[in-house]
Design a protein with these regions (language model features):
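N-terminal Rossmann-like dinucleotide-binding module
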Residues: 2-65
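Short acidic low-complexity segments
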Residues: 40, 69-81
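C-terminal capping/lid region of NAD(P)-dependent oxidoreductase domains
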Residues: 3, 134, 161-165, 368-383
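Short, well-ordered coil/turn residues at beta-beta hairpins
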Residues: 88-89, 252, 261, 280
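Glycine-rich phosphate/pyrophosphate-binding beta-alpha loops
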Residues: 203, 262-270
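Predominantly a Rossmann-like dinucleotide-binding segment in NAD(P)-dependent oxidoreductases
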Residues: 142-240, 373
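C-terminal glycine/acidic-rich active-site capping loop/insertion
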Residues: 228-234, 238-239, 247, 251-252, ...
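Beta-strand-loop-alpha-helix segment that lines the small-molecule cofactor/substrate pocket
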Residues: 83-85, 91, 96-143, 158
Length: 383
């Protein structure tokens, strides 16, 4: 068994998502396990160099994970042929230019979503990557959540029958910054800085819908800025110029209807921060991030509408938990392992830049729907 080194430029990992999910729980965890196992018995050991503007902060982060390589010189890192993969988790506005530089330098690229703030920029990167012949991927982490994987198993088994509708509820109350500090960065609420829940979350909903229930064919969306003013990290008040809630209905191939409420201005009274209620002809299921409950046709209660008496049926009963039939690793780590195998062994990899561009396409269609107050068709996206 041979151990093969894979040099990875990790850009933008000083932020919460980059540091926690991509560095600590993915790359560092993979290294601690001895690398990624390939089909031939070899292992691939990722050797990251942390790249960013603040070398002191990068050095502290590297030390915490037993790493030594850091740099603030991106150009020099891109020129180093010993590191063949470029990863970006910095701001969306910077991403297209960074990916373009990395592809031009011959690097394979992997990045957070959204790929870009607009479809034109996203497709330009897709075309550049295709012309260069490099391997490329986009984070689509929700597909790897235990709840989503168990839900997909239910659907594929035929338990739900013909799918009818999906109702998604996502979000929580993000504090304005006065009563309590906000738990999300202030740029999320400034449109000029790439903020907005439509840009953030509809990229997720596109791949969740496409891969779980059916391809999105049209969208009707209403956005809102419910909280007009917030307080930033320095204690200064600022005007919220980005949408903090989105109410979107999707038509899917096969006739399935999906509706998602996404909000950073809602208080949670449901099973999880994200729940998907799926109805089919033979059964229904409600999935959270980790757990899924289901109800089959013969166990469905038969209520009768009578507002004059207290409801006698407890509708939370009669649902069965879907058991954990396997152990579920971190979703970001699983996708990193799949991408590393794709780069080093040529294994198939579905979640590429074109799939990421589809998310940006849906965002643009949703924003157009909101602006024009009408349904917008979502055409097939081709290179």
């Amino acid at each position: 068994m041979a151990v093969r080194r894979l040099g990875i430029l990790m850009h933008g990992v000083t932020g919460r998502m980059g540091a926690n999910q991509h560095l600590a729980r993915s790359i560092a965890a993979i290294r601690a396990e001895g690398g990624v196992l390939l089909a031939n018995g070899d292992r691939v050991m990722p050797d990251p160099i942390l790249v960013g503007r603040n070398e002191d902060k990068l050095a502290q982060l590297a030390k915490a994970h037993g790493l030594s390589r850091v740099s603030s010189n991106l150009e020099a890192c891109l020129a180093d042929r010993n590191d063949t993969v470029f990863f970006d988790a910095a701001t969306t506005q910077m991403r297209p230019a960074l990916l373009a530089k990395a592809i031009a330098a011959g690097k394979h690229v992997y990045c957070e979503k959204p790929v870009a703030t607009n479809l034109e920029a996203a497709m330009a990167i897709v075309r550049q990557a295709k012309a260069a012949g490099i391997k490329h991927g986009v984070v689509q982490d929700k597909l790897f959540l235990p709840g989503l994987r168990k839900l997909k198993m239910l659907i594929d088994s035929g338990f739900l029958g013909r799918l009818l509708a999906v109702r998604g509820e996502f979000g929580y109350w993000v504090f304005e910054g006065d009563l309590q500090p906000a738990q999300r960065p202030s740029w999320n609420y400034r449109g000029e800085d790439g903020g907005g829940i439509i840009l953030d979350m509809l990229c997720h909903w596109r791949y969740v819908l496409d891969n779980t229930f059916g391809s999105v064919t049209s969208v009707s969306c209403l956005g809102a800025t419910h909280i007009p003013e917030r307080i930033d990290e320095a204690g200064n008040r600022y005007k919220a110029t980005a949408d903090d809630a989105a109410y979107a209905t999707f038509q899917l191939a096969g006739g399935v209807i999906a509706h998602f409420n996404s909000s950073w201005a809602t208080r949670v009274r449901r099973d999880d921060l994200l729940t998907l209620h799926v109805d089919g002809t033979h059964g229904s299921a409600v999935a959270g991030l980790q757990d899924v409950v289901c109800q089959q046709r013969m166990a469905t209660p038969k209520p009768v509408w009578n507002p004059d008496v207290k409801q006698s049926i407890n509708f939370y009963q009669g649902w069965q938990p879907v058991p954990d039939t396997q152990s579920f690793d971190n979703g970001f780590k699983l996708q990193w392992e799949a991408f590393i195998r794709h780069v080093t062994a040529g294994t198939p990899y579905t979640w590429d830049l074109l799939e990421g561009a589809k998310g940006v396409q849906l965002v643009e269609c949703a924003l157009k729907s909101w602006k024009e107050r009408r349904w917008i068709d979502v055409p097939e996206l081709k290179v």
